[in-house]
Amino acid sequence: MLSNLLNEKTVRIADGKKLDWKTSIKEASKPLLEDGTILNGYVSSMIDVVEKEGPYINIGPVIALAHAQPNGFVNRVGMALLKTKDSIALTSKDHMINIWFVLAAVDSNSHLESIKELTKLLTDPNNVEKLLSANSVCDLLNVIKNVDLNFAVKRKEDKK
């Protein structure tokens, strides 16, 4: 479940006034650094990829999913979320971001279920609006938990 990865330790809110896109990725990564999920080299890898490839991590209006190839800097699958009250330009003003996800993968497959659940969360415009209007970590977690519940119910129905 998404809430196993996105919880009170890995979800944060910042005003964003003093952040640029690199600092936003670093701030979003902090919980994963603090709990040993990733090492600093992974944060550098995520920034390097954006510098080389452009804003490909901009996966939808106001949403970025920072990630890099699985490498020796990831100890286990992890995800973190930073919501900024102010929009931050990801490489240019054409890519304004408020919702910064960080995904850490140890291989090419172990994170796929998490991606599927994240897709369920972010493809519903109502969920995105709720994330944007959230004023607390608790508000953000409630949106995520609600999606988890709906996802679990759907899986049970699909098995019938």
Spans of features found by a protein language model:
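Cytosolic covalent-transfer regions centered on His/Cys nucleophiles
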Residues: 1-160
